[in-house]
Amino acid sequence: CGGMDMDVKGGDIVVATGAIRMEGTSREYAPIEFPAVADLDVTNALVSSAKALGYTYHAGVVQCKDAFYGQHEPKRMPVSYELLNKWEAWKRMGCKASEMESAALFIAASHLRVRCGSDFLVVGNQERQEAGLDNPIVHDTEAAIKVAVEAVRRLIQADKQA
């Protein structure tokens, strides 16, 4: 994913608590007014796993979109005014990162009554780059995978004790 909040750096982990539904798939499952939120138990397991493994993490809302280049080159798009204005609104609302999967997963999971959560490796943060701040670019997803695997272990253990 790409960081949006200035505190989010490449190499950090983002745990999504909810997703802005700026994509089309989730609309096939539920009206746009229905929120795309992660399961609380899964979210807590992801956060506790990131902490236990010693990773820098950020939990919060992510922006979920269909178009990769709308984020990275919005001025080239016919709807640039809309993309730029919404991007600014999401930042002002404290959105942590931009990605392309969580909204549909959270909505489908709500419909199916199953637990779902998501964690991401932050590749970089274009906002930090534009501000001239340190912006490490990281492509190694091992940390996000380790967090997810540890979270599943914790969920299995909790389910056994329930």
Model-inferred region functions:
Residues 1-162:
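Glycine-rich phosphate- or other oxyanion-binding loops that anchor nucleotides, phosphorylated ligands
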